Amino acid sequence: MKVDDDLVRQVIRPRLRGSHKGSYGRVLLVGGLYPYGGAIIMAAIACVNSGAGLVTVATDRENIIALHAHLPEAMAFDLRETERFLDKLRAADVILIGSGLGEEETADWALELVLANIRSNQNLVVDGSALNLLAKKNQSSLPKCHLILTPHQKEWERLSGLAISEQSVSNTQRALEEFQSGTILVAKSHKTAVYQGAEVTHLEVGGPYQATGGMGDTLAGMVAGFLAQFASTDSYKAVIVATWLHSAIADNIAENAYVVLPTRISKAIPSWMKKLSL
């Protein structure tokens, strides 16, 4: 599949006058355990700016003040509140887990809670340290849901067993067959590609100016936001366009910046989406 104006406009469409926040999906983001609180904040900022209707963050209680200082638009609660966690999980259209989650006992507990309770009609975006935790589990026992994986090359090595030097298109497609049918893979690298089954889309955007902390968290937040907001669109197309837009904005910023900060990408998302929807 090629990223062109037609594909972008299939995904990013003008909003209907009679729509409301409930029309644009509910997202639950899980992560930001000490000392990685900033990661989930950046993911949430990207998710809100991408247009998700209602965004809730499950994180360390100590991280909530910082989150609301940067993003009062998001709701937040202590990740360890099990009943609230389950309520928000059941209500979500999209769950993003892994941004700043870490790999300690609480992180694994949170991932297990999500895997045990997610429903088949929900989207699960797995990013960051949750990918490493997932790599230690039996892939055949994963729940039936709409699964989206967003690993960089080393994380994909742990998940797939493919060394970085072996991560060709054909090998990656074969490895993806070990996951449930329909799984979407965003294989992040200097030549990012998005896979689903036999489909693969290579992106011709992005560069080394994106090599900074929080870049992947921001992408994961955008992917979650697009899946929530554009639920009537083919998920594969929505993920492709979110991933493309993330790096297209970075390319534009890099014309006048040596390094592109993830938060600058997030600030630019609404204006870019407005322009692309016309």
From Swiss-Prot:
Enzymatic reactions: (6S)-NADHX + ADP = AMP + phosphate + NADH + H(+); (6S)-NADPHX + ADP = AMP + phosphate + NADPH + H(+)
Binding-site positions, (6S)-NADPHX: A39, G102, H152, D217
GO BP, sorted A to Z: metabolite repair; nicotinamide nucleotide metabolic process
Lineage top rank: taxon: Bacteria
Residue ranges occupied by any YjeF C-terminal domain in the UniProt entry: 4-276
Cofactor: Mg(2+)
UniProt enzyme class: lyase
Pfam families: Carb_kinase (PF01256)
Gene3D superfamilies registered for this protein in UniProt: 3.40.1190.20
InterPro entries, alphabetized: Carbohydrate_kinase_pred_CS, CARKD, Ribokinase-like
Cross-referenced SUPFAM superfamilies: Ribokinase-like
Keywords: ATP-binding, Lyase, NAD, NADP, Nucleotide-binding
Annotated positions binding AMP: G216
GO molecular function: ADP-dependent NAD(P)H-hydrate dehydratase activity; ATP binding; NAD(P)HX epimerase activity
Enzyme Commission number(s) from the entry: 4.2.1.136
Assembly: Homotetramer.
Database matches in NCBIfam families: yjeF_cterm (TIGR00196)
Protein family according to the UniProt entry: Belongs to the NnrD/CARKD family.
UniProt cross-references to PANTHER family, sorted A to Z: ATP-DEPENDENT (S)-NAD(P)H-HYDRATE DEHYDRATASE, ATP-DEPENDENT (S)-NAD(P)H-HYDRATE DEHYDRATASE FAMILY MEMBER
Name of the protein described by the UniProt record: ADP-dependent (S)-NAD(P)H-hydrate dehydratase
Organism of provenance: Streptococcus thermophilus
